[in-house]
Amino acid sequence: MDDWKPSPLIKPFGARKKRSWYLTWKYKLTNQRALRRFCQTGAVLFLLVTVIVNIKLILDTRRAISEANEDPEPEQDYDEALGRLEPPRRRGSGSRRVLDVEVYSSRSKVYVAVDGTTVLEDEAREQGRGIHVIVLNQATGHVMAKRVFDTYSPHEDEAMVLFLNMVAPGRVLICTVKDEGSFHLKDTAKALLRSLGSQAGPALGWRDTWAFVGRKGGPVLGEKHSKSPALSSWGDPVLLKTDVPLSSAEEAECHWADTELNRRRRRFCSKVEGYGSVCSCKDPTPIEFSPDPLPDNKVLNVPVAVIAGNRPNYLYRMLRSLLSAQGVSPQMITVFIDGYYEEPMDVVALFGLRGIQHTPIGIKNARVSQHYKASLTATFNLFPEAKFAVVLEEDLDIAVDFFSFLSQSIHLLEEDDSLYCISAWNDQGYEHTAEDPALLYRVETMPGLGWVLRRSLYKEELEPKWPTPEKLWDWDMWMRMPEQRRGRECIIPDVSRSYHFGIVGLNMNGYFHEAYFKKHKFNTVPGVQLRNVDSLKKEAYEVEVHRLLSEAEVLDHSKNPCEDSFLPDTEGHTYVAFIRMEKDDDFTTWTQLAKCLHIWDLDVRGNHRGLWRLFRKKNHFLVVGVPASPYSVKKPPSGTPIFLEPPPKEEGAPGAAEQT
């Protein structure tokens, strides 16, 4: 090895030096800084370009405004501009404008499309049965009204007739049937369809399908009909396609005088339909009312909360009656709408009232309950000095002396802690059981349907424990519970000052309304002076009841109380009957008596300590439950209380609670 020499061609070996951690991280940081500088430079350049573009836009805008000011055009308000709006150019030549309309009718689905845009589609199960009606503006083609009438149910055909009669001449009418629409389609409705030019509508049969397009007072533009082949089946689906020529804007407008009221009217009538003479060109119905002031009005500054949803035609009718009542203060009225629906707010604006919308909370009964809570809370927040609030619903007619009735009785709520509310509604006040508009009662139930609520009761008791959104409870049933009422009573009139006209709602249909609401008596006499109002205070009322029972003639208990002959053919007398009532919640006989008297019998209402007061044959009729009522002492020793046994319940028959 002594003679070994390294090759001159091989590079000398040297140990590889490992890069330190410091140099490694320095290298990485240098690269990151370079990337960051590059991004920052790009961002600055982008901002510079944006600033330059914006400056150019501002200069162009100023130049355009300057040019416009040199040649100004007459200023146009909303209503004038609306009249000159042209709809989009439809197919056709020249000035002829045409809508393409499709209408579909079947067992489970209906739809309407206008120029390819679906304006109605209903395929929900167990909903939307009956005749769907759409109204289009004949000049613009926009939808002015959408309604569905369940003409399988009673009285819905009457509502349809009323609506169609209120549509202005010239409007485009579209009708289509879902499921079944003929069962309660009476002759009056068929005659109206015939007058519109329909051939199939008046002959509509069980489960037929039908689609119709026409102008009111003008030609039929298309119609299709499929007859059901058997009772157990439906007609084939029909699809109607037709052209609808549009008319000029001049034909669709009214030329009212330019006033603030008419501007409100024009705004309303250009958007919606089905409100009759309020949109008449020749003689429109007033939208401002001047009822007589109420002397010594004790409810002048009491806020009025109108609880509403998406039933604008109901709201329109209700507000007209409310604003016509003597002593009304429009500035105290607030309409609370459950949801952001446009047409109810249009109705509110038409009358120049305050409207508040809010997002619905909950479903079904819970949604209604939360709507009431939100509305009541908002009312007392809007009027922090108010001691009371009047609560109304959108489906009530209001009597002309509604505020007079409240003005004469509201002091009772201040002076008597044993009172829960004052209500304008008598649950048992039917045409054949109510007689005296000056007479008041105390009752253990809370009727609602036009009532006065004390602020302290709501803020201190009800609001803190109001049912939460997940509880599917009816708010009024909750308020009637003993835990809320706590032995307190409500003041009601013998003759109601409100009338429940609504037949469409969460817990309402035509059958139910026909049975329990249609024949309620409603006061139409103005200026009624209530009699002996202070006798409604707790102690005084007991004196009054004992006086009545002492003067009352005991009826013959061997007779059937359901027969007309049970009461003599007299007038102005006071009679009393004693029925079996073993304990406070034993209402077996009363329920059967209420049923045969054709008054409210689904649960117990209108009673005071086991006593019911009503009229029969214009005689004051008292019913006392024995032995539960303290007034049982007035029963003659020899008399036997009347007992009416309920009929045996049929197997599978629904109970009262299920029927409501």
Swiss-Prot record:
Pathway: Protein modification; protein glycosylation. Keywords: Disulfide bond, Glycosyltransferase, Golgi apparatus, Lectin, Manganese, Membrane, Metal-binding, Phosphoprotein, Signal-anchor, Transferase, Transmembrane, Transmembrane helix. Residues 300-646 are annotated as: Catalytic. InterPro entries: Glyco_trans_13 (IPR004139), ILEI/PANDER_dom (IPR039477), Nucleotide-diphossugar_trans (IPR029044), O-linked_mannose_GnT (IPR052463), POMGNT1_PANDER-like (IPR039474). Disulfide bonds join 254-281, 269-279, 421-490, 562-596. Residues 68-93, 633-660 are annotated as: Disordered. A carbohydrate binds at residues 129, 179, 207. Residues 473-481, 506-512, 600-605 are annotated as: Interaction with O-glycosylated substrate glycoprotein. The modification Phosphoserine is found at residue 7. The GG-type lectin domain is known as the stem domain in POMGnT1. It mediates specific interaction with beta-linked N-acetylglucosamine moieties of O-glycosylated proteins. It also interacts with its product, N-acetyl-beta-D-glucosaminyl-(1->2)-O-alpha-D-mannosylprotein. Belongs to the glycosyltransferase 13 family. Interacts with DAG1 (via O-linked mannose moiety). Interacts (via transmembrane domain) with FKTN; the interaction is direct and is required for normal location in Golgi membranes. This is Protein O-linked-mannose beta-1,2-N-acetylglucosaminyltransferase 1. The lineage of its organism: Eukaryota, Metazoa, Chordata, Craniata, Vertebrata.
